[in-house]
């Protein structure tokens, strides 16, 4: 639990630093050092080094899968701080507090990825979502940001109520909050247990913006400050999916035949709605919001298959999707025009940035030789083993083909259209380009040698 202790400590530290009057550069450097230490701490824990072994009444226990996911999340978080840390200053005056909230969110990530009690799962999700409400509405001068925060809070509270009701029904059916005892006693499910299971399923589907519980996503992502939208759309979504997979694998694995068809239906619906609606978007920010819904559909295939390849696919999807989306949003944050036309002629103005964006978009589309292609392949392979798997996989492949169209609209704007007269592009610093180049290289390397990441699941 190295990361839990360090994240909590650094979150409190960033709160006190805000009172010291330090410069933005110093605050940003301290935050980057903290996130780098979180990443190194997960690597150290994988090698057996623990600062302190927390027990917490055996309500959470970290396994190899959780550690690998946390290493991916903290590594991407470090890159996120390098790319977007400076842009947080443009949101408001509470610069240090933004970093503090993100560190507290990482505390929630640890609980979501290590819970063995339904209460700890609930606590972890709330530790993640409450700071997100604040970050969404952090641009207090912007009415869209305020509206997005209110929508997110109200709908999130409704989703939390569903989860609590589900946990209560499961406790009433089994007399325990322990996920391991639920799986041991779930040979013959009762109506009470099934009711709790589906309430939790629907609640978590809302958290990951799976259809038909996705309706909040475009407005919230569009209204939130862009610098925080990238964090919400990547690390938060990935961590929620990893917890989703852990819950249904550990607690409800023996009831797989009961909920599997529902997971498949939600995956198909999410893929169709996300991809079809993304086609009609003119704003790149809203396009990425609907794209994130479609990507949630692919991640849902891992839950639907929940067998060989599902965990490997989830880890690879977490890395490829997070890296590509963080890179695209970091560039989008600095653009003057968020529409697709705003990218017209970018390849002539700055071919290096355009090339990196092209790699990221190709990865999101699932083009071969990128990490996104192998991530989708693992998910499709996992789905094939499920009931009606072939039908679901065919629909998923068709929707992946649709996604190629709207991602290529951005590529077309960058490479095959001239910039509008008077259009101005931001100047990207050398350090910013170096970090983006590193992300593009990671996407390509993982697309060719995924074992560099996946072997940590077993060794």
Regions of interest found by a model, annotated:
Residues 1-459:
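Alpha-helical transmembrane segments of multi-pass membrane proteins predominantly involved
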